[in-house]
Amino acid sequence: LVGLSGSERRRIHELSGGQQQRVALARALAPEPEVLLLDEPLSNLDQALRETLKVELKMILRQLKVRAIYVTHDQSEAVTMGQRVAVMRQGRLEQIATPDRLREAPKNVWLAQFLGHPNIFSEQSLSNATGIQVQGPAILRTDLISLGGNVAAEVLSYENQGSLIQIELLIPSWGLSVQWEGFAREVPSNIYPGKSVSLHIPDDAWVELGRK
């Protein structure tokens, strides 16, 4: 189950870091626990091995139908492993939700910053923006922004990140610059700094935040 067949007689110092973690997992699963606590189980492994083991670990837990509480400081691990994710701040629970819900609707400004939202706007910055219905503070979801619409914008910067394109846009009617990310195949090749474009930004792209 944990991929250690044929290693029964090997000593601990003869095992790799990944194999040692598999031994620890097998020992934890042997008593058939109802709930398994995993505290930073992959933190001492290199990146490539972490990526492999977190997928394997999730499959094993799902196969055995074992509930697990998985503690980690790695956001990508939390999103990969968790059906529900709880974010703690100085010992206090900030929010618990599915990974998608957490990303799409963080509870407050601190959580939005912690999750790395690129477009976080204060109440003051939104108060002078024309045509925006939210009061602020708020985030603007980049995944709901698309090219082609009735919001005029100017490209400030353009960064090719391989399969993704990162674009900074100035929206004159709002007096705000926003970050937008799109798949390279969906972004026209004639986008460049200084070019005027139009954006579609639906009302539900705005998510109001609590202040604390």
Which functions belong to the PLM regions below?
Residues L1-K107:
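ABC ATPase nucleotide-binding domains
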Residues Q19-Q20, P118, L164:
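Gly/Ser/Thr-rich beta-alpha loop segments that engage phosphate groups in nucleotides
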Residues L45, A105, F114, G148, ...:
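Residues that scaffold the ATP/ADP-binding catalytic core of kinase and kinase-like folds
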Residues M88, A112-L115, A138-R141:
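Short, conserved beta-strand edge motifs with alternating hydrophobic and charged residues
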Residues E104-N128:
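C-terminal boundary and immediately downstream tail of ABC-type ATPase nucleotide-binding domains
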Residues A129-K212:
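Non-catalytic connector elements of ABC transporters
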